[in-house]
Amino acid sequence: DNEPCSASPPTAPARSGCWSRPTGSPWASCAPPCSRSSTDRRADVRPAQPADILACAALCTEIHGFDRSGELKDAIEQKTAVVVEHLDQITGYATLIGFFGHAVARTNQDLMAMIAAAPSFQGPGFLLPTRNYLVFSWCLANGLTLVMQTTLMTIGLYNEPAGAYFPGVLY
């Protein structure tokens, strides 16, 4: 059910929202303009290649404290993984823009570039921490709909990621 939602402040509890495009939405056609931030920072999104795994693993370790290169390798083989580059350096990757994928990015602009470049979202949408107000409000402004609100739960120690991300349900 698509209930109206309000933006959460940056200090909100750990919640994620599942996002999808409304049926017939023109948002998918806005990929080129949406791939630039308000500061016109150029970010290029392309399919991930096996040669990208080490750089992506290092980025994931920088953001999360561990790497998820096994999942990335599988996603590259399935041709669902993408990377975003800025100044010829990988600044983010996604195994899949969808419910079962995850993404890691150095900046919010890198995460938004990958979302904007996605031709579709797999499954019911993708999970996005709604406490990331900048990306949350950008999604709303670009016609995405909050489908459900969820709570991030962990067993044991949890370290807040040091960058932009969206979690996957499989890890």
Predicted regions and their residues:
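Conserved catalytic-core motifs of GNAT/GCN5-like acyltransferases
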Residues: 6-10, 16-38, 146-158
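Conserved N-terminal entry element of GNAT/NAT acetyltransferase domains
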Residues: 35-50
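Intrinsically disordered, low-complexity, positively biased terminal segments
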Residues: 2-3, 11-14, 46-171
